[in-house]
Amino acid sequence: MAQKMRGVTLHATWAPKPGFKLGAKDIDHVQTYLGSQVWKDPYITIDEYDIPEPGPGQVLIKVKACGICGSDVHMAQAKDDGYIFYPGLTGFACILGHELSGVVVKGGPGAKDKATNKPFKGGEMVCAEEMLWCGSCKPCADGWPNHCERLDEIGFNVNGAFCEYIVLPDRCLWSLEPLRRQYKDERDIFLAGSLVEPCSVGYNAVIERGGGIRPGDNVVICGTGPVGLAA
């Protein structure tokens, strides 16, 4: 009999606004790339789930920390007309949470740490990318995995980390073990690990898209939330 865990689940009603048409990547009554045009009357429950088993190339992680992102709030928050605020890729019902860190429980067949090319060890501390890119489509091959043609997003259209355990592809995991040199308390490592995803948003804007900054440059940062502070 499968062991159980609890997860924070967001539910919403599929009710496309008048004139809405399914996009090429939308799936009727399942997911859309225009969440605020489709999903209505959101509500949250705490539900019981089977603890998932990792398949080939996947890793089972015990979640230790997970941040609350503005997008989590905007998916759970409705406008006056009942539609959710969040405009992006969404598929409900779904466990929320994507700013996560945790401990490897076990790896599925062939699951490897991309930094070492060795199998993941139980007990290794890791964090995860929020976007589950395929690695084989043209945008992925061109170095733009955030434009993946078969994109899934943790906590948006596939189950996220507001739960006790999560299974993720090995290619989307990053080891936090080097942080042992900076932190004596493992709890601090997990907190730092949960900040990797939001900090990477600021890094992508400043370095990848913005071209970087140099000593003496004058810059303006619009926003004083976690991403703005990271930038």
Listing of model-derived features with the role each one plays in the protein:
Residues S71-Q77:
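Cytochrome P450 core scaffold surrounding the K-helix E-X-X-R motif
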Residues A2-V8:
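Short structural boundary motif marking the start of a folded domain
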Residues D50-G67, D81-K138, L179-R180:
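Glycine-rich beta-strand-centered segment in the early N-terminal region that forms part
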Residues P87-H98, K114, C134-C222:
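NAD(P)H dinucleotide-binding glycine-rich loop of Rossmann-like/cofactor-binding domains
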Residues G228-L229:
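N-terminal Rossmann-fold NAD(P) dinucleotide-binding loop
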